[in-house]
């Protein structure tokens, strides 16, 4: 048996490799011969390839195994540009290579060559491939122009590339071609123009579309009925429906075009989008005059218009009319009608229409389900909304972003923000990635329930998941930071908003200015407002209003008025709310001459005083003791048919108590609070509130107005009224009755005592000499989680001093810093008065020196006088504030809350 030696075996096994290598070397040698030594294309190669192509010897060309390059292909196309078949063959051969693809320059040559040969189908195919290369439209256009100049061919390609760009939605590139092709002897065709116009409108570029139409007319391109329909649609979508109507009529008369149902449907839809029923009727009349038949789209637009206006009966009538016309309602029409019912809160009718749709065999879709979910959520029927969400799977429908966002919003509005967050996680599992809109809904949800720390946590989660915040996200976070009192973080976020260019409108600006002013940082707010023009954001009236209110809050009334004057110079006129604030400020800081000026000015501007305006005036007159002017303002309200509310009545009653007009105050309280209903059998209070025969006629008139004209629902007693009643009893010396009323109110479950209620009673007990009861009430406050403040302790110190127990009062003073409470001028003045009366003048002088060191002494006080207000109900510090409860201020009287702020 013959066996091969190892050397022979190796040689035998290497034969195929050696043969292949020999062939490859030959090919490379040929390719080297075809190129010059420096890598450039050799003329003889170009000549040989061109000759084979011209002779049609394509098989021989394939055998050459050409090493294609951009230079080789472009050279051949340039050489054979008058032979489209040869060019097409070499281009296709090059396109089939494994390691080579023609570049954009080759494509530009090829489309010109094919266009000249009138091979438009292949030209368009290659143009689509050229666009798919994703080269810059400007670069492609430049090369097409260069080839056009080099070859001296027809510019037909320019119109074709315009149409391709338009059809692909690349309107920016299409517009560049449209603007420049006229320079090279080619105007756009009507088909290309229509394609460009249609895609511009589809992308929402309505104003650009109208401008393109004007250019098209200037190019003397005659529009057809399709052009007119597109332009009408552009006008309608930009909100200029009347202009669309004028354009349609002018086109009809000047161009002699017969507008079709598409044009009229666009007009009807335009009027429908703005809820103009009369406009829709005019178009319908025009259709009848022109003999244009209505179709399903026509009726769908009519239903949309009626739904937009909330005229659901008319919408249903149109829906029934469709059946009489033997037209079949489609999915879209059902969806429009159901959405109308959902938006108007008629969810049962929406479900009825949906059931009818399913019954006749029309399939539901995601948009319809979204409308139903939205309707259920808005009516608070979350369970039903969840059922629709679950049934979408049965209907083979996939929830989209809008579905989830609607349901998330429903949970948030109902206060179930944690459930909404779980649904957000479920979105991720279903591969529906939450968008910034989803997170905005969640952020608003947490903010709405006051969970501001959760707002911060959600913000961090959003950023961690790679979701870019928008202006709404930032404004919500800013609001949360201000609520938490975090000034530094708010400023950092504001700088980030500016750096990212998110300040596009006044939403975030208003939140920033308002937040800073509420923190009494008006200088920072003013600085931001001064620099905001750099970012092309124009402040609105609400922006200036917030700044003006901020100055009012910090006591700088001059700057508050300066803001008003500045905005007027800018052509922005103050609202009634701003006037209300300035009126309150003029009263508070005793600029009474400005009050009348403001009232005259607001009337001259055509503004109507609101209940808040009258409340500010009544509060102001009461605060300075001018009860007659307060009465006159009340009578003006009554004459104008404006209802007196509980806050205004409480304010007047409180002022009457302060002026020792107890009978008149009681008469008003009787009309505000039905104590017989609230506390049946409470005879002592009833006797106290019974007015005497000497009651002022003006007060009687107001009381009768309250009884006769004020809806009971507007006079539901609140803490203010009850506090006024308790204060009135204390003022009248009926401390036991006040305590009994307090006890009975607690048992009625209609009253939640606050720190100010306790302060009233503590003050009453202390003044009456029952200091032990006063301290017991103080302890009761603490047990209920209500923290006593300086006014509470001032009342206790006053009671101790009145009993002559000055030592205990001093000990209580020394304990205040341990409780985190800072003594004020009232504290020291009360104790000084007690020390002087007890004969300890030296200690009184020491405290006086301490007051001076702490800056608590003003003007004449440094000479030894004590400035204590004369008109008080309980204590010069106590007043009912704008929050609905009593505020404490050492420089103001006990006062019902500022009605203007409360109502606003």
Swiss-Prot record:
Keyword presence, Membrane: no
Keyword flag Repeat: yes
InterPro entries recorded: Mito_RNA_Proc_CCM1 (IPR051114), Pentatricopeptide_rpt (IPR002885), TPR-like_helical_dom_sf (IPR011990)
Annotated Gene Ontology cellular component terms: mitochondrion
Q: Cross-referenced PROSITE patterns, in alphabetical order?
A: PPR
Stored SUPFAM superfamilies: HCP-like
Instruction: Please state what the protein is called.
Output: Putative pentatricopeptide repeat-containing protein At1g19290
């Amino acid at each position: 048996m013959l066996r091969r030696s190892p050397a022979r075996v190796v040689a035998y096994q290497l034969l195929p490799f050696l043969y292949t290598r020999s062939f490859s070397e030959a090919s490379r040698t040929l390719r080297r011969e075809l190129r010059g030594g420096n890598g450039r294309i050799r003329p003889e190669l170009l000549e040989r390839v061109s000759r084979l192509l011209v002779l049609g010897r394509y098989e021989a060309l394939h055998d050459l195994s050409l090493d294609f390059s951009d230079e080789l292909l472009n050279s051949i196309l340039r050489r054979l540009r008058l032979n489209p078949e040869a060019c097409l063959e070499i281009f296709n051969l090059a396109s089939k290579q494994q390691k080579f693809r023609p570049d954009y320059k080759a494509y530009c040559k090829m489309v010109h060559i094919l266009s000249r040969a009138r091979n438009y189908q292949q030209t368009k195919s290659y143009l689509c491939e050229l666009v798919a290369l994703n080269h810059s439209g400007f670069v492609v256009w430049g090369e097409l122009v260069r080839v056009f100049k080099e070859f001296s061919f027809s510019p037909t390609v320019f119109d074709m590339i315009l149409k391709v760009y338009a059809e692909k939605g690349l309107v920016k590139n299409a517009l560049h071609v449209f603007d420049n092709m006229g320079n090279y002897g080619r105007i756009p065709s009507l088909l290309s123009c229509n394609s460009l116009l249609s895609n511009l409108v589809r992308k929402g570029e309505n104003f650009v579309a109208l401008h393109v139409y004007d250019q098209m007319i200037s190019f003397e391109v005659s529009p057809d009925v399709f052009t007119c329909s597109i332009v009408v649609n552009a006008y309608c979508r930009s909100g200029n429906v009347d202009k669309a109507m004028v354009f349609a009529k002018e086109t009809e008369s000047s161009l002699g075009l017969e507008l079709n149902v598409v044009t009229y449907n666009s007009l009807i839809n335009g009027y429908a989008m703005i809820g103009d029923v009369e406009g829709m009727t005019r178009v319908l009349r025009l259709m009848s005059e022109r003999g244009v038949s209505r179709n399903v789209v026509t009726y769908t637009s009519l239903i949309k218009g009626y739904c937009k206006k909330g005229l659901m009966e008319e919408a249903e009538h149109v829906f029934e009319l469709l059946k009489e016309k033997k037209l079949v309602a489609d999915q879209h029409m059902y969806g429009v009608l159901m959405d109308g019912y959902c938006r108007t809160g008629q969810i049962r009718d929406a479900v009825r229409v949906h059931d009818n749709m399913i019954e006749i065999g029309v399939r539901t879709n995601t948009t319809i389900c979204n409308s139903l979910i939205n309707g259920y959520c808005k009516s608070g029927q979350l369970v039903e909304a969840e059922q629709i969400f679950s049934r979408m799977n049965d209907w083979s429908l996939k929830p989209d972003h809008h579905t989830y966002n609607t349901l998330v919003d429903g949970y948030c509005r109902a206060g179930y923000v944690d459930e909404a967050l779980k649904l957000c996680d479920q979105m991720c599992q279903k591969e529906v990635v939450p968008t910034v809109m989803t997170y905005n809904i969640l952020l608003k949800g947490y903010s709405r329930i006051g969970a501001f720390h959760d707002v911060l946590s959600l913000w961090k989660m959003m950023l961690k998941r790679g979701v870019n915040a928008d202006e709404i996200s930032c404004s919500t976070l800013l609001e949360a930071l201000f609520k938490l009192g975090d000034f530094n973080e708010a400023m950092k976020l504001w700088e980030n908003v500016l750096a990212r260019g998110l300040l596009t409108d006044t939403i975030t600006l208003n939140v920033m200015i308002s937040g800073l002013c509420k923190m009494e940082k008006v200088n920072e707010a003013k600085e931001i407002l001064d620099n905001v023009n750099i970012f092309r954001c124009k402040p609105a009236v609400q922006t200036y209003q917030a700044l003006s209110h901020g100055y009012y809050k910090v006591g700088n009334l001059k700057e508050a008025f300066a803001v008003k004057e500045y905005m007027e110079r800018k052509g922005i006129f103050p609202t009634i709310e701003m006037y209300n604030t300035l009126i309150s400020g003029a009263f508070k800081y005793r600029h009474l001459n400005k009050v009348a000026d403001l009232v005259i000015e607001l009337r001259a501007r055509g503004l109507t005083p609101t209940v808040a305006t009258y409340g500010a005036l009544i509060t102001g007159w009461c605060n300075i003791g001018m009860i007659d002017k307060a009465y006159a303002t009340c009578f003006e309200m009554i004459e104008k048919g404006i209802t007196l509310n509980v806050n205004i009545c409480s304010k007047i009653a409180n002022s009457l108590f302060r002026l020792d007009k107890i009978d008149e105050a009681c008469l008003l309280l009787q009309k505000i609070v039905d104590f017989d209903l609230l506390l049946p059998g409470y005879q002592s209070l009833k006797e106290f509130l019974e007015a005497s025969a000497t009651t002022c006629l003006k007060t009687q008139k107001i009381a009768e107005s309250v009884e006769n004209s004020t809806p009971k629902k507007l006079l539901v007693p609140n803490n203010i009224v009850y506090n006024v009643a308790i204060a009135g009893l204390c003022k009248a010396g009926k401390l036991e009755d006040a305590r009994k009323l307090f006890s009975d109110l607690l048992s009625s479950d209609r009253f939640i005592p606050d720190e100010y209620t306790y302060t009233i009673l503590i003050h009453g007990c202390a003044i009456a000499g029952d200091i032990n009861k006063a301290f017991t009430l103080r302890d009761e406050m603490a047990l209920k989680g209500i923290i006593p403040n300086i006014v509470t302790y001032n009342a206790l110190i006053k009671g101790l001093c009145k009993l002559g127990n000055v030592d205990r009062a001093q000990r209580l003073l020394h304990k205040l810093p341990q409780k985190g409470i800072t003594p004020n001028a009232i504290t020291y003045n009360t104790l000084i008065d007690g020390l002087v009366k007890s004969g300890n003048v030296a200690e009184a002088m020491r405290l006086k020196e301490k007051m001076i060191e702490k800056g608590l002494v003003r003007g004449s006080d440094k000479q030894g006088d004590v400035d204590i207000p004369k008109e008080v109900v309980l204590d010069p510090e106590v007043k009912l504030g704008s929050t609905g409860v009593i505020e404490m201020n050492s420089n103001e009287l006990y006062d019902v809350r500022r009605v203007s702020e409360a109502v606003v």
